Amino acid sequence: MRKISSFISLLLICLAFTSCVDYVQSVTFKNGKYHMYYKVTLSKLLFAMMDEDPEEIFRGFDEEALGEVPENASVSPVNTDLEVGAEFKFGIDPKTTDETEKAFLPTIAGSKCYIPFILGENESIADSVGTDTDNDYGEAFAEAIMSSAKCRILISKGVIPSIETAYFEGKGNQNYSIPVFDYGDDNCLEIPFIVLSQKGMYRTDRVVVIRK
């Protein structure tokens, strides 16, 4: 799972300069299996402004480059008029004994459910905010951009019917509260990208969801 998060974090470094990034992660449960979906895309407008070829990032990208992902994972390019990126899909039996697959599964303990958040695993993300700024104004500007960009986690109500609260665990019980929105068949968790730069304060490799 470390390899896939490294790939995604490479793309999201662009957030140091623009908020033209979209990250979506979802989990559903159908026919006795968890179905996982991940998508990360960049705006083609960004590359047009930089006079760069957006498809160059994804050229030669395939499942082998991902490393630790389930063998049944499918990887598809995303290439529309507005964005370019990749999406990943795979199903996992909740009774699997495969360690790679188990790393992606939600874990339920009483009223708590732990949702793996692969984007929060990579250490380089913490270095992508404010590290290249030479003054307080530059750092504040970078943080403002990061705060406007959000990662979304969609959790099917077939997995968790109702959510009371969601958060990242913090030191000294100072947790980071994550907003939850009702999307009909799903609950949506919106995570500002800026919080991923605060790894010393929060455990960001998983989201704690409290069920009602």
Regions found by a protein language model. Name each.
Residues 21-23:
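Bacterial signal peptide processing site
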Residues 42-68:
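Post-signal-peptide N-terminal segment of Sec-exported extracytoplasmic proteins
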